[in-house]
Amino acid sequence: IRRPPRSTPLYSSAASDVYKRQPLICAEGYLFEMERRGYLTSGEFVPEVALEHPEVLENLHKEFQHAGSNIVQAFTYNGHREKMRVIDKEHLLEPLNRVALRIARKCADNPPKGLGVSLMAGNISNSNIWENNNPEIQAKVKSMFAEMVKWAKEEKADFIIGETFYYAEEAFAALEEIKKSGLPSVITISPMGENKMRDGYTILETCKKLEELGADVVGLNCFRGPATMLPYIKEIRKVLKCHVAALPVPYRTTKEHPTFFNLPDNNGCNCPSPHGRTFPTAMDPLQCNRYEIGNFAKEVFDLGVKYIGVCCGASPMHIREVAEAIGLRVPASRFRENMSKHFMYGSDKKIPKHMKEYGNVA
């Protein structure tokens, strides 16, 4: 990828060749991964790690780049004014955003050898307070978006991601604020278990409207695993002319449970979570394996989707699987599995025969 001049939109006009030449891979798994590593409070889900342990955040960006993510998304998800108010830390709003943006910019400007140029994305997301027919609340949300977009532009973001919207009108409002900045936009929606937006729009209607309003990339992210996201990506890709994004969660969602919020654990669990549901801290046995994620990436890539990633639950191994499934060799490919050398299951002639024979009963 060759970064275009800052005055040139990334996904349109003269810079369209950038997008055509190489797929864009976006790791969006920061929230769950930071919680797993002990640097983020589950339930609150606020990216305080940017201020408290910036070196940890920088390292995770680097790990995702090593695995193939050529987009470095600033970890400002849930770092908006409303969420900071809920945890009584609204005074840290701007410092958190600016530090997260600067860390992402630093990593994008210093990609690992073998990755190529990385792009840095600012981020705005679901406010969790949007209400239909409530102009006062809607104005408040737009103001929240506006300040975060402003900071992202000032910290030299290449484009802005607006993500995880389950109200169509909120997604439209996010796009409106991004467009005011002059930066390219990626807008991804996250319909919940009713398989429609909470304000009544269908998934396809919402995506078509986003394209009409000028979004550069439109698609789905979060909540849905590969099985329940793929059918909608197929529909969207057929209808939309703009670029399409697909970023599932790595969990085995089903037709009965299309999102990860109410997934049951039928795997013999004898110690359920204290809050009574698998989401968000007891979903470990419900994860997709890496090959399922790779298969999803290959399927959507073959449909013509070139903006691909993995959302909550992603780890670097998932991102590498995405990259390799669509034909890329990335720095982490150096450590791709090599079962031929395994002490029981390897095919190498140097592996003792008696150990190979023992493999099926080990």
Regions found by a protein language model. Give the residues of each.
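Domain-level signal for soluble alpha/beta catalytic cores
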Residues: 13-362
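Single conserved hydrophobic/aromatic residue that forms the stacking wall/gate
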Residues: 1-15, 19
